[in-house]
């Protein structure tokens, strides 16, 4: 069977797989979560689980805030909105009104254990003076606003349980219950909060496609009821990121294709070269997508953005073949033409693959996926040219070659020894001066385009609900659940002091809702003593007909009881439970004012660590930025050895110098534009190396001096296509992608400019 037939069958098979992967699956194979690019925290499984649990809870929830001047109109708007919200396929649960069952959940959970539950304030008062409790109860009973009933006095004569419940609910002080809605007022405005749980993953592109229905509902509610409706949640940021990335992929891909089409029509003036070029590009992207999904299960949007840029590399192989066909009409031989450029395009592929193979071994899913996509895409484009072009382009071109006078003049300048030395050296010196101002930035936020409108809504919702603008997560560990709760109580006492002194705004910990058994035993002893020593006094003060008797046995309230109750719905996700030999929980601190004080305290707590995913990711980026730098240096070294083996040291130096200088200049220009250098700028240098080597290799492989103009025409067409792609990429709203585009754009221009340096004066190949 002929190789071209085998390749055609393989491409057909990949096309079928593409349909199966995209159209016949319930979920899209395109991953949009930026965290999926990153390696998991291998050093601390507890930290990784903590982050996953917190992220899942946050990612799958949406918070709505209705704002209006009239309370009753606002309630009507909330009724209409919540009734229609649950009808949307976007959500599987809506929390609007607080049901009677939810309101009773607190009493249902805690009331059976009331003889062992005390707030810290009440516990302190009883330890100092139990007699003062009697006076407190008397004042409450005779107060017209306290609402103490006979039934409550019978079951809880010292009113300890109401104090305990009141202390647990203090976190909701920003809101009051109005017609079963959580209502808050700030100035002249009233606010109602509604929460909803997504019916899937916030990063699922199919789920994101349903967002317009929600936006239409919000607009309708605002128009009909004359209220303002704000929203926040990962869904909105993820959808914005997806749409931005898709738009950029479209801009890059379509922009590149339009550039290719115009160049092909302008230079070759025939449909066959156009179809052949599209064939090699299409096969490269098709096979790369299918193989990446097969290996990783999904393909990340970033890989697609980077993959779209491979058009500029893969088209290079096609341009050289098509230029040969255009310039040798009378003596055209399709197979001989392939043989003529075979060494150059093969070496070009090998040198490109050398750079990407190093990334394949990195324990970094994002780099592995990007590397695989690039390797498979370039190899497939190369095989399409080698296997298909000789069969599909047997007939000679009927188009007259373009006038190459300008290209001849440019090449003639390169015969000048002074230019061959001054231009590369001058660029190198200027670039090195620019690099003295280089700054590195590994902040994960450079990968996120954060729209101001969404950020403003999020800040407003946090302000009204009393949630901190900045949250710090702490991971607390202990050998058992009981010791963990004791440790959380110890931390909570310190945090409560900071809350009072204004060092922090607030905090949330599981120990605020479920005391340790040790704490329950202490409370039980205090309450029992209170009944025994002050029961008779209280009976006389209130003229009870029966003696107050303590008849409660101790039965511990356990973490399992709390987690299975509706009370745990807001914060139950903070409890991680047991992993291996450890139990763990997360504490949230809102708006730290005195950072130094808190950091100093936490450093002294051996079982407490800060869960800062942003800092962790930035550290990972810094590590792999160094790794890619080393891989880039290794790629240059390996390519240098390969070139010296084939061409000798002198010509190898001439081949490698242009892409090297291009990379240095590209970094310098990026720095001049005040763009910090990231891992993505270094990935851009890999691309500059691969494309730049292609340019110089074709000059080095020339057998005759007359071929130089043909070679320059081909690499000029390739460079224009690539520059067009990355010129558009540099317009990205995402800082990291913008910087990536600027680096590649500059590098390709300089690589093209210096490529004739590799022309041989003695046209002999070793």
Q: Model segments located where?
A:
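Pore- and gate-forming transmembrane helices of large, multi-pass membrane proteins
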Residues: 328-362, 704-733
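Hydrophobic transmembrane alpha-helices and their membrane-interface caps
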Residues: 273-320, 651-698
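Signature of alpha-helical transmembrane segments and their immediate interfacial
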Residues: 1-29, 388-444
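Solvent-exposed, non-transmembrane loop/terminal regulatory segments of multi-pass membrane proteins
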Residues: 22-69, 172-178, 437-479, 696
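Transmembrane alpha-helices and their membrane-interface boundaries in multi-pass membrane transporters
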Residues: 294, 310-326, 342, 346, ...
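Juxtamembrane segments of multi-pass membrane proteins
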Residues: 424-541
């Amino acid at each position: 069977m002929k190789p071209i037939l085998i390749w055609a069958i393989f491409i057909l098979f990949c096309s079928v797989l593409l349909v199966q992967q995209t159209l016949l699956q319930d979920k899209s194979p395109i991953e949009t979560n930026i965290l999926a690019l990153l390696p998991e925290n291998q050093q601390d499984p507890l930290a990784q689980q903590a982050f996953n649990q917190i992220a899942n809870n946050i990612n799958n929830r949406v918070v709505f805030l209705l704002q209006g001047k009239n309370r009753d109109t606002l309630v009507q708007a909330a009724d209409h909105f919540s009734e229609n919200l649950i009808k949307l396929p976007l959500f599987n649960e809506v929390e609007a009104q607080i049901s009677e069952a939810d309101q009773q959940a607190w009493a249902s959970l805690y009331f059976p254990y009331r003889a062992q539950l005390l707030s810290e304030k009440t516990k302190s008062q009883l330890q100092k003076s139990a007699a003062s409790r009697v006076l407190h109860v008397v004042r409450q009973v005779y107060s017209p606003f306290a609402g103490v009933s006979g039934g409550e006095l019978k079951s809880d004569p010292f009113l300890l349980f109401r104090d305990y419940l009141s202390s647990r609910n203090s976190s909701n002080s920003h809101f009051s219950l109005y017609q079963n809605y959580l209502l808050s007022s700030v100035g002249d405005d009233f606010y109602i909060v509604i929460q909803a749980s997504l019916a899937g993953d916030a990063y699922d592109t199919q789920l994101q496609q349903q967002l317009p229905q929600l936006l239409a509902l919000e607009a309708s509610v605002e128009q009909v009821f004359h209220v303002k409706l704000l929203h926040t949640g990962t869904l909105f940021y993820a959808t914005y990121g997806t749409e931005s990335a898709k738009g950029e992929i479209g801009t890059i891909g379509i922009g590149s294709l339009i550039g290719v089409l115009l160049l092909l029509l302008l230079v070759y003036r025939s449909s066959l070269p156009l179809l052949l070029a599209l064939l090699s590009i299409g096969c490269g992207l098709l096979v790369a997508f299918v193989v990446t999904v097969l290996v990783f299960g999904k393909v990340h949007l970033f890989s697609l953005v980077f993959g779209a840029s491979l058009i500029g590399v893969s088209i290079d192989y096609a341009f050289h073949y098509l230029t040969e066909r255009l310039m040798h009409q009378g003596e055209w031989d399709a197979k001989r033409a392939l043989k003529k450029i075979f060494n150059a395009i093969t070496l070009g592929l090998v040198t490109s693959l050398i750079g990407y193979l190093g990334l394949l071994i990195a324990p970094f899913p994002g780099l592995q996926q990007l590397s695989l996509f690039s390797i498979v895409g370039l190899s497939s484009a190369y095989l399409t040219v080698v296997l298909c072009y000789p069969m599909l382009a047997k007939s000679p071109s009927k188009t007259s070659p373009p006038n190459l006078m300008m290209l001849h003049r440019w090449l003639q300048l390169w015969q000048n020894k002074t230019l061959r030395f001054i231009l590369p050296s001058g660029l190198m010196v200027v670039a090195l001066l620019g690099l003295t101002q280089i700054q590195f930035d590994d902040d994960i936020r450079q990968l996120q385009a954060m729209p101001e409108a969404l950020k403003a809504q999020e800040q407003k919702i946090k302000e009204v609900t009393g949630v901190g603008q900045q949250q710090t997560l702490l991971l607390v560990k202990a050998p058992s659940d009981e010791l963990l709760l004791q440790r959380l109580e110890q931390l909570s006492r310190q945090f409560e002091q900071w809350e009072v002194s204004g060092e922090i705004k607030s905090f949330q910990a599981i120990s605020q809702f479920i005391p340790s058994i040790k704490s329950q035993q202490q409370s039980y002893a205090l309450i029992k003593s209170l009944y025994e020593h002050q029961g008779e006094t209280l009976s006389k003060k209130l003229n009870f007909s029966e003696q107050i008797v303590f008849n409660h046995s101790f039965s511990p309230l356990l973490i399992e009881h709390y987690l299975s109750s509706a009370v745990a719905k807001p914060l139950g996700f903070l409890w991680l439970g047991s992993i291996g030999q450890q139990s763990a929980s997360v504490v949230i601190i809102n708006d730290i004012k005195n950072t130094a004080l808190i950091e100093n305290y936490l450093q002294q707590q051996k079982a407490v660590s800060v869960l800062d995913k942003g800092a962790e990711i930035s550290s990972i980026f810094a590590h792999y930025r160094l790794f890619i730098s080393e891989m880039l240096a290794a790629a240059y070294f390996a390519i240098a050895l390969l070139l010296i083996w084939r061409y000798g040291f002198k010509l190898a130096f001439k081949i490698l110098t242009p892409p090297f200088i291009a990379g240095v200049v590209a970094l310098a220009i990026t720095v001049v534009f005040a763009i910090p250098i990231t891992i993505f700028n270094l990935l851009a240098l890999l691309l500059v190396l691969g494309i730049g080597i292609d340019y110089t290799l074709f000059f080095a492989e020339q057998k005759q001096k007359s071929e130089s103009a043909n070679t320059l025409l081909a690499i000029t067409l390739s460079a224009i296509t690539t520059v067009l792609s990355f010129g558009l990429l540099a317009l990205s709203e995402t800082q990291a992608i913008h910087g990536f585009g600027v680096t590649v754009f500059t590098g390709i221009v300089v690589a093209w400019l210096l490529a004739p340096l590799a022309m041989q004066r003695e046209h002999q190949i070793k």
